[in-house]
Amino acid sequence: MKVCVIGVGHMGRIHAEKLRDMAGVSLCGLVDADTNSLEQAKTKHTAPRFTDHKQVLSIAEAAVIATPTETHYAIARDCLDRGLHVFMEKPFTSTPEQARELIDLARTKQLILQVGHLERFSPAFREALATIKDPMFIEAQRISTFPNRSTDIDVIMDLMIHDIDLVLSVVKSNVTDVQAQGTPVVTDKIDVANARIEFGSGCVASLTASRASKKKERTFKVFQKDRYITLDLLKGKMTAAVREKNGAIHLEEYQAERIDPVMDELVDFVESIRQKRKPKVEGEHGLQALLLANLIKQATEKNLAGHKASGTL
């Protein structure tokens, strides 16, 4: 299968390396408007290089898009129009309207459209998934040092959206309320944020994301009747405290031997094309995460604006 990578910045280069090593896949082109990025990719890849994505559409069967978010819609539309299956890095698009249009286009063309919410492929999350039933409280911490990239978007769209997607994948209920706070720290966009999300089922999710820390942490905790699950997504570890009928508590532990969610999501993309089946993370999932992320962003900006206004009195 001939696959091209459009956008060879940090994530694009990672995707290119995984595709290069994947059986049955030919990396048929690397695309980036920045010639410096193409030159950096040249040291590891012999695939043809292009500065315009339209130059590769006639030779590729599928495209991995890892460009700035504001360019996602136009590039994906061109790819789908030409009959290419599309894997899109998160966040899906700049607006829900753009996402809906791409979903409809992919459906009409009978093409795979997958969004890169890679934590769905975390071995710890997959191990826990079968035991998560009717969660009542979820707490997620996604903390990172400043990456000096993805500064075109805020921390909600950059980091928190991963946990938003995980929450939506396990809570099968409508969102009833969103409260959020955040502030810029190292950029002019929100760099630290906390959101409280309430669902009709009674479940509450508290999500914290920061790209202004001295350490890295990615934990996801789920509380439900008779079970408390802790996931360390960086280490691929799951710990569950389980209450038995007699009141006794026992621990269940899982440690992944292999952690490579980027490879796993790309394998799912390629196999969904080959098998003509839906990928684990469809365009619709990307849209739902984007919609909730937008609500959190709006609540954060409203609170931040109110704080600034009150400070002038």
Where are these regions (language model features)?
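C-terminal helix-rich "cap/oligomerization" subdomain common to oxidoreductases
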Residues: 62-65, 270-313
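Active-site loop of classical SDR/Rossmann-like NAD(P)-dependent oxidoreductases
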Residues: 33, 255-267, 281
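N-terminal Rossmann-like dinucleotide-binding module
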Residues: 1-44, 167
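Mid-domain beta-loop-alpha active-site segment that forms a flexible
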Residues: 116-123, 146-175, 285-286
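Beta-loop-alpha module in the N-terminal Rossmann-like domain of NAD(P)-dependent dehydrogenases
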Residues: 15, 45-103
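Contiguous beta-strand/loop segments that form the cofactor/metal-binding neighborhood of enzyme cores
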Residues: 164-237, 263-277, 312
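A contiguous active-site-proximal alpha/beta segment in oxidoreductase catalytic domains
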Residues: 93-150
